[in-house]
Amino acid sequence: DMDYDMANSDIKPNYMQRKALRELNRYRAIGQERALVISATGSGKTYLAAFDALNFNPDRLLYIVHEGSILKKSLETFQKVFGGSKTCGLYNAEAKETEEDFLFSTNVSMCRSLELFDKKEFDYIIIDECHHAVADSYRKIIDYFEPEFLLGLTATENRMDNQDVVEIFGNNIPYELRLRDAIINDLIVPFHYFGIRDELVDYGLTASGERRLISQISTPENCEFIHQQIEKHRMEGQKLKALAFCRNIQHARMMADNLGDYYHTAFLSGKNKTGERIRAYNDLQDENRDLEILFAVDILNEGVDIPGVNMV
């Protein structure tokens, strides 16, 4: 049945996705109504979900994720897989498209609107980046709806607070694809990892010393050291396209300012609208644009695909 249904799509699942699809089919065949797929970042989780939905063939589908740019890219992925056979709509702060076959919603928007939907409104529900599923907004959505099948997607089921994500999905993990296996199977790009000793910063500071730690990291002396390391390890003859992860907005602003002495920099946070973020991602990857280092706070930790990046 799966092979027959897949023939209806111009885009085909890769080898690893086909293994996951077979296992999801098997779990449903034995009566399981929930499952969690663990798959390395960038290995094709969204396409996997779209292929499984194509095989399941729901009348109505709900896709939940926490971030707007991920939401729109997920919608586009489903449109590519389904073609014109299903209508797709957004349900977030900017749009409330409720009549479409498939709805793509942020957790916050859907949590605030549950009373507008019947409990059995959706046959198939997908929770993307589902390590967030222990949060109240997600739990309200999961506890409210009664789909025929609930699928969770994540790159890691482990949380710093040790709350159990797997239990939410009935302790069912039909498929796992860890980082090493994804690289071996050419699903994600291999990378060179450099551990660099930094003697200018006291990393032994406790949480209460966070401001002091950020000040040390952002000093001109330390930024000069970072500049030296970037130049030592960057891709020779190529435009630098680097992402830098920061603790908070103050940290990002200070790093962008100080490394701005050497590179064209910018910083983004949750305060930037989706359109602003996408423009920055495009500028970073564009050979004809000046942007070389993009500093980010919280928004690039998961679910964003920026294939042109050559340094983190």
Q: Where in this protein do the model-derived segments appear?
A:
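Conserved helix/coil segment N-terminal to the catalytic DExD/H
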Residues: 93-124, 135-140
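Conserved Walker A/P-loop ATP-binding site and its immediately adjacent core
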Residues: 48, 55-80, 247-250
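A short beta-strand element within the Helicase C-terminal
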Residues: 122-123, 292-296, 300-312
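Walker A/P-loop
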Residues: 30-53, 245, 295
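Conserved pre-motif I regulatory segment
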Residues: 2-36
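Conserved helicase ATPase core of P-loop NTP-dependent helicases/translocases
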Residues: 72, 87-98, 243, 253-254, ...
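Conserved interdomain linker/interface between the two RecA-like ATPase lobes of SF2 helicase motors
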Residues: 173-243
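Post-DEXD/H (motif II) to motif III coupling segment of the RecA-like Helicase ATP-binding lobe
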Residues: 131-193
